[in-house]
Design a protein with these regions (language model features):
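Core beta-strand elements of the Rossmann-like FAD/NAD(P) dinucleotide-binding domain
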Residues: 2-4, 122-131, 245-254, 265, ...
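Rossmann-like dinucleotide-binding cores of NAD(P)H-dependent redox enzymes
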Residues: 85-91, 160, 166-170, 176-236, ...
Length: 452
């Protein structure tokens, strides 16, 4: 049995862990294409598609700015080629680089634990390691009523690879994946029908943001909320129908399942290594990334409560330090974790939501609409808002939530302020805010907070 100083299962954020110092031999195991979900089937390709939909939406809005433009053609194949030619090249380059690293052995196959710090690759190649890191990511959840229906469906893993654009898509789910793909395909001219069990889309987000986005979504998509799917069936020669508990049916040409994600931990043989899992399937780790088995660590979607690539990367950097400095362990940086949804309009969030604060602690709130700023006038924006929560006594930010144009950029100075402990008053008046830039939305929201 070949032995390594370090074995890493997963080539997404796990790839960050490979030490530059070739003091020991490293095994890197990947069951699929090199690079992980974010690069191949997740955040990166979907955001390139989303920007294409943004451009299409701008064209449709051109008349409101006195411009005579119209969207006359959508070349789906050209859009796909633009996305995947870049993605596939990055994946191939990454694989080639790792395979060519002297102290790294790349195993292309599925790893399974056979004992403490022992693995077998594709049930053929046994290896062992002093330390093993599980970074296997996550995959889409498919409810049994759909999985067992016999009806063709797509998930985020495969929807971007469809050969042609359908006339309509039925999306089961109302979270960030559902919202982003609804934006992508509606922007390209596809009729969207959404079905969600929750009373609002993006339910885990701040209530005010979730309610506002739901109202906006209903203006352009056929949205069915508090809806329970009872059956999925074929409808005619090529269509599908989703039957709901209230007796209605939602029909379309293609079915996209965006009902959440689950960690890729169920077929790793973790019990053979003494690694415990939580009820939701995530590997149980402490604040340093250690599992319940000595010498075995985990990061990213396999164990983290945050299904976010920037969190997985931060955990990987922390874990790289911990592996190199066992006497000086650092905790995972899980404070002030921001997130964004690249739908239309964008949504960005960090910190406490209104439902976290009401009845639990003192707070003050302020909301600034985009329409109350000069750049908001330029955008003709009547929907965008920035909502902030702060502690009235300490003057520190508690939470920030933005819905609107470039929300993912506008949230960043608020993330920085919260992360460094900068007070609201100092942030608002301790620096210049460029006039009449869109950042005045944030400035004005800060100034509206009534502090003691």
């Amino acid at each position: 049995m070949r032995h390594f100083s370090l074995a890493i299962i997963g080539s997404g954020s796990g790839n960050v862990l490979v030490p530059e110092d070739p003091a020991g031999q490293v095994a890197l195991v990947e069951a699929g294409a090199f690079g992980g979900t974010c690069l191949l089937r997740g955040c990166i390709p979907s955001k390139i598609f989303a920007h294409t939909a943004d451009v299409a939406a701008e064209i449709r809005r051109a008349a409101g700015f006195g411009l005579g433009a119209e969207l006359t053609r959508v070349d789906w194949k050209a859009i796909q080629d633009r996305v995947f030619s870049r993605i596939e090249q990055v994946s191939a380059d990454g694989r080639r680089g790792r395979a060519g690293t002297d102290h790294v052995t790349l195993f292309e196959g599925r790893a399974r634990f056979t004992g403490p710090r022992e693995l077998v690759i594709d049930d053929r190649t046994p290896i062992s390691a002093d330390r093993i890191v599980v970074a296997t990511g996550s995959r889409p959840v498919v409810p049994p009523v759909i999985a067992e229906s016999g009806v063709d469906f797509r998930t985020s893993d495969s929807i971007m690879e469809i050969e042609r654009l359908p006339a309509s898509i039925v999306i089961v789910g109302g979270g960030y994946v559902a919202a982003e793909f609804a934006h992508i395909f509606s922007g390209l001219g596809v009729a969207i029908r959404m079905i969600d069990m929750a009373p609002r889309l993006l339910g885990p987000f701040d209530t005010g943001i979730s309610e506002r986005f739901t109202d906006l979504a209903k203006r352009k998509w056929d949205v069915h909320l508090s809806a329970q799917v009872t059956r999925v069936r074929r409808d005619g020669d090529a269509g599908i129908a989703v039957d709901l508990e209230d007796g209605s049916a939602v029909t379309g040409d293609l079915l996209l399942v965006a009902a959440g994600r689950q960690p890729n931990t169920d077929d790793l043989g973790l019990e053979a290594a003494g690694v415990a899992r939580r009820d939701d399937g995530r590997i149980q780790v402490d604040e340093y990334g250690r599992t319940t088995a000595e010498g075995i660590w985990s990061l990213g979607d396999a164990s983290s409560p945050f299904q976010l690539k920037h969190v997985a990367n931060a955990e990987a950097r922390t874990l790289a330090h911990n592996l190199a400095h066992p006497g000086d362990l650092r905790p995972f940086p899980h404070d002030w974790v921001p997130a964004a949804v690249f739908t239309e309009p964008q949504i960005a969030t960090v910190g406490a939501r209104i439902q976290d604060l009401e009845g639990r602690r003192p707070y003050v709130a302020a909301t600034q609409p985009y329409s109350g700023t000069a750049y908001g006038w330029a955008l003709r924006d009547t929907d965008g808002i920035c909502t902030l929560y702060a502690d009235p006594e300490t003057g520190k930010l508690l939470g920030a939530h933005i819905l609107g144009y470039q929300a993912s950029l506008l949230i960043q100075p608020l993330v920085q302020a919260a992360s460094t402990g900068l007070g609201v008053a100092e942030m608002a008046r301790g620096q210049y805010w460029i006039h009449p830039a869109l950042t005045e939305v944030v400035e004005n929201a800060l100034l509206k907070l009534s502090l003691s």
